[in-house]
Amino acid sequence: MLKREMNIADYDAELWQAMEQEKVRQEEHIELIASENYTSPRVMQAQGSQLTNKYAEGYPGKRYYGGCEYVDVVEQLAIDRAKELFGADYANVQPHSGSQANFAVYTALLQPGDTVLGMNLAQGGHLTHGSPVNFSGKLYNIIPYGIDESGKIDYDDMAKQAQEHKPKMIIGGFSAYSGIVDWAKMREIADSIGAYLFVDMAHVAGLIAAGVYPNPVPHAHVVTTTTHKTLAGPRGGLILAKGGSEELYKKLNSAVFPSAQGGPLMHVIAAKAVALKEAMEPEFKVYQQQVAKNAKAMVEVFLNRGYKVVSGGTENHLFLLDLVDKNLTGKEADAALGRANITVNKNSVPNDPKSPFVTSGIRIGSPAVTRRGFKEAEVKELAGWMCDVLDNINDEAVIERVKGKVLDICARFPVYA
């Protein structure tokens, strides 16, 4: 018999210590990785529920196992909320991750060897949009598009590449692009050659849900997203579509199960349902508006301190600092800021002379600090501290002084009060 009072601390001290240390790290470090965020206790409650015990291969009302009457309710809630939130008429909430969701879309719509037009990873794209080290780059003939000299997506080049190579699919979406994407223009280019438009909106899903960033769902044939990042839910994936055929939706469902996955993670799907409900609340819109304001406020400080920001600004939650002119590598900047309890990630910049393991830039995002309650005043102060560290990257006294300020502001703005 399993006793409810069982706990990790009394059973596995070594593991518990690591978990507790991570909890402290999250409270005492400022998180600026653009893809990270903090889930609500409600989301974590769902993930730690008894739903983790239930196998439920199939879809609501069409399961391969008995005893699914309640998990059917859970999954249908998640499906209905996803459709309502993003204005879709199809949703699949089962993908275990954004990459799994993307894989399912490729499986449903393409054959190995088909030509695909995707954003260059070095200019803001994502691994699953055609990187040669990823399944997408191994299975398909990838033609990259990129950005122009101003740092904006080059739609003329995209249209030219589309006409020349006649891809079966064009991918919209990014992991390190700070501008507004013209989804309608992308659909126009796709329609001109009879291609699918597939949008991966993982990074901006929360902003889109709140009406702060344009929604691709009315324009794309298929859309995927993660449920964490700006959406602030559990780690997982989601597929959406609007105006498609039942045949398309059946292909997408089959590409998730049974093609790519077996049993869905019902505890995670419950957590997705919670997060989607939270994203419908008025305070979520206020939060996302502040995310965008905070990113702009940080950019202003970096520019005033003489740092180069790729594309000159941001229209979403993230931006890239180009450190080439400062003779700094992303790896060095990442490490120095980390010693000051400020977490970022090194990131390649356009025409980067360094390898992806070193890079010449860092990516900065505002979702997590905004979740803590930071507003413009706090993020401007934070950006100034970051400049102090980068200006004095080998001065441990400066780094320690900034670390003290970070610990103080983290205590004033706890993640979980």
Curated annotation (Swiss-Prot):
Specify whether Transmembrane is a keyword of the entry.
Answer: no
The record's GO CC annotations read:
cytosol
Q: Which GO terms describe its biological process?
A: glycine biosynthetic process from serine; tetrahydrofolate interconversion
What are the record keywords, sorted? Answer: Amino-acid biosynthesis, Cytoplasm, One-carbon metabolism, Pyridoxal phosphate, Transferase
Sequence positions that bind (6S)-5,6,7,8-tetrahydrofolate: 121, 125-127, 355-357
The record's listing under SUPFAM superfamilies reads: PLP-dependent transferases
The reply to whether Transferase figures as a keyword in the UniProt entry is yes
The domain of life for this entry's organism is Bacteria
- Cite the CDD domains for this sequence: SHMT
Principal localisation:
cytoplasm
Which enzyme class, named as a word? Answer: transferase
The modified positions for N6-(pyridoxal phosphate)lysine read 229
Which cell locations does it reside in? Cytoplasm
Q: What GO annotations for molecular function exist for this entry?
A: glycine hydroxymethyltransferase activity; pyridoxal phosphate binding
Catalyzed reactions per annotation = (6R)-5,10-methylene-5,6,7,8-tetrahydrofolate + glycine + H2O = (6S)-5,6,7,8-tetrahydrofolate + L-serine
Q: What is its EC number?
A: 2.1.2.1
Required cofactor names: pyridoxal 5'-phosphate
**Pathway listed:** One-carbon metabolism; tetrahydrofolate interconversion; Amino-acid biosynthesis; glycine biosynthesis; glycine from L-serine: step 1/1
Q: Which InterPro entries match?
A: PyrdxlP-dep_Trfase (IPR015424), PyrdxlP-dep_Trfase_major (IPR015421), PyrdxlP-dep_Trfase_small (IPR015422), Ser_HO-MeTrfase (IPR001085), Ser_HO-MeTrfase-like (IPR049943), Ser_HO-MeTrfase_PLP_BS (IPR019798), SHMT-like_dom (IPR039429)
Check the record and name the PROSITE patterns matching this protein.
SHMT
User: Site annotated as Plays an important role in substrate specificity: where?
Assistant: 228
Q: How does it assemble?
A: Homodimer.
Relate the protein's function as given in its record.
Answer: Catalyzes the reversible interconversion of serine and glycine with tetrahydrofolate (THF) serving as the one-carbon carrier. This reaction serves as the major source of one-carbon groups required for the biosynthesis of purines, thymidylate, methionine, and other important biomolecules. Also exhibits THF-independent aldolase activity toward beta-hydroxyamino acids, producing glycine and aldehydes, via a retro-aldol mechanism.
Similarity-based family? Belongs to the SHMT family.
Know the name of this protein? Serine hydroxymethyltransferase
